[in-house]
Amino acid sequence: LQVTLLESPDVAPIGVGEGTWPTMRDTLRKIGVSEADFFRECDASFKQGSRFDGWVTGQHDDRYYHPFVLPHGYTETNLVAGWLARHQDREFAGVVSFQPHLCARNRAPKQASTPEYAAVANYAYHLDAGKFGLFLRAHCTGRLGVAHISDRVVSINASDDGDIASLQLKNHGVVAGDLFVDCTRMQSLLIGQ
């Protein structure tokens, strides 16, 4: 399997803060990324859930909290019925999960001595997306054998069935492939043609 990253020199990466889901931990682990390097290079921090303020009524006390730790016993009983019967004056997540309490106290999901990608509480990351893109490119080209071409797509060459057969680049000729993934955001350079 040969993977080639084709990147336009004319399009600046998005350099805003982003949040991920816990599945990102396993993805990074599987491709051999050091979690310590990832934190350092991408200005990453722990994310233990998502809180949506003003979720239903828009009032200051209206929020929905989605912790990343599954509630104990959630497969054996209807936790919502128990919450409604006994604790509906409190936030559901805080009743069924310890993770909102960790977050409220600014506690991490693991200790400094906990091995990479292991944790007491499930977590994801907040990160700088621009730095993350550069970090992944360096890791994938340096350690995973991904080829990198910085060039512009001039035209798209279709096969008889209408699928993309190859891309004509401004400076690097033709790049053929079996699968093309369009990451050109709103431009939809490949999907739109």
Name the predicted role of every residue range.
Residues 1, 31, 191-193:
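Short, well-ordered amphipathic alpha-helices
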Residues 1-16:
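Glycine-rich FAD pyrophosphate-binding loop
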Residues 4-7, 24, 31, 38, ...:
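General structural concept
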Residues 7, 42, 154-155:
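Conserved beta-strand edge residues that scaffold enzyme active sites
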Residues 9-12, 58, 183-189:
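Short loop/turn segments at secondary-structure transitions that flank enzyme active sites
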Residues 12-103:
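Dinucleotide-binding Rossmann-like beta1-alpha1 core, especially the glycine-rich loop
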Residues 89-127:
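Alpha-helix-centered segments that form part of catalytic cores
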Residues 114-193:
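Predominantly flavin-linked oxidoreductase catalytic cores and closely associated redox partners
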